[in-house]
Each structure stands twice: as structure tokens, then as C-alpha cells.
């Protein structure tokens, strides 16, 4: 009853994936629940053993570099699937003029995760589809998945991720109050000799101009200053280095200035101690959606911000390129100045960025997670 009410109140289609084991402890079934915006529940059941056999060749064809990951088949909770997905993200990072023709994984993943439920998804691309994955599936870059015609999923639908049904809540997200924005870019000096990010500084200044505020840049961008401002902000945008720890997710961190002998790292564990009221936290940094994989998602920066009180986060799944990321982010905030929702604004920004930077490595890294 709750999931039906949430779907109706949010006017969204909810897609929940659940992996079922047999008596031998093997992943044997993939259960998929789809709840449309009218509250109607549909259920699809997929045979994972059959899927393993069907996609083994396709997985191997992704690239020679993913052969080792593919050798384990599609065991959806085997740690090797994380390597498999990482290899796909690696392929996205590698520029290729023949991307749509050569890269097999996004089409295989589309066939596995989207095709069985495609008839249940909304026809209007502006209508929201919220994916609620399990385990390593949380790292699948859904916007970059492709159908047989080479069309990306983000071209077909407005997308968002959520760790759980409960995270979505019953209410529509409130409009972001950009008058209480914290914008940070290119802290200096960086800890551990991390490189300065001139593109992140330009990005922060451009976004601050759109929002009518001033960005915190360079030596002013200390961890102490950021924490103090975060707890008052309704919108937080952090353009800096992100470091993830896939073994101890709570040690994933964001880099800030080391001025005044500060260590310069704000960890996911430290974020849990904050009391936030932000409608949106944007982590414009590398790998901010990564962390330790568990059965119910990723333990890392995104989850910590949500648990600390943020309504939504925007995070990345791989090393993001400077210029394309700056273009995507500034476009996203420009789109938000209208009456678009956060997922709609991100979709528009991705489609616009795609025109200048056609490779998915440039535009598909970021996902919205949360309410």
C-alpha cells in the first residue's frame, strides 16, 4: 500500500530489483517490481541461470579488458560483477568514435534490466522513472544503457536512483532555495599533493553567478568553513577531488584546503555527524557515487549525506573530465531556474552536453540519488 501511495503522490514509475538465491546459495532469480504513477503494481521474474548463459559471450565481447570479469558470468552479487561494471565504466572513459557500434555491455545490460519491463515504463520521456537497485547494480550507469537502435536510456526517460522505497518519501521534493547555497570550488592547497582543479574553480564561479551568490575558492575552502556553512545551506555544490574506499566505504572523502594545518579530508564517516537540511548536495568530483558494495547499495559519500539529512545527492560513478563536467553542471543549474524537477533538469543537461561531448564518458557519470 505504501509503495502504491508513493508512486501516485510522486507521479513516478518505481522499478525495484531484487536478487533471489536458490538452496545452493546461487543467484537464481531476478525479481523486478514496477509500480506505475497510477499505483498499479506489476511483477516480472527473470531466470538468472539462463541470463548467465545468454550473456556470457556478450560480456566477453565488451572488451578484452573485461574478459576476466566476464569469466565469472553474470553472478549479480559476486564481487566480480563490480569488476565487470568497473570495466564498463573504463570503456566509457576510453574515447571511441565507434562507441555505439563496438561497446556491447550497455546493450546487454539494457536487454537484461530494461527490455523485460520496457512495456511498463512511461511513454512520456519527461515522466520520472526511479530505479531501486540492489548491491552492485547500484553502480550500473543507467543513463548510458542502450537499446538495439543505439538510443540511450536517458534519451527515452527521466531517471533517478533511490536506495529504498522509504528514502523516496510521500511528498514531492520542494523547490530548491538557491538563496541559501554553498558553492565550493578548487580548494588550495590540496591535501596529499592532489592537483589543483582550475576547471572546478571556473565551474564553481559560473554556478555561483547563476545562483546570485559567491563561491568559496582556494584557501578559503577549508573543511571547517565548509562544515559550518553546510549545516545552514539548502543547496550544496562541492567541486573538488573525491576519493573512494571500496573496502571501508566510510573512509571515502572529499578534499578541502589544508590551510591552518587542517588535514583537508572530509570523510563519509565525518559527514554522518553533520545535521543537514539541504534539498540537494551535488558532489562534482570523481567517483563520489562509489564506495563499499553491500546488499542494499553503496556505503560511501552519497549515503552519508542522505543519512545526515540531505534530501538528494548528485554523484559520479567514475573519473569525470573537467570541461564536460563543467558544461553539464552549469547547464543543470540553468535548467533548474525554470520549473523543471531535479531529474528533468539533469536529463536536459545530459542531452545538451551530449551534443558537444558525444561520448558517454563525458556526460553519463552523474546520477541523482535520494528523494
Give the ranges of each region predicted by the language model:
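Residue-level detector of buried hydrophobic side-chain packing
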Residues: 15, 32, 129-131, 184, ...
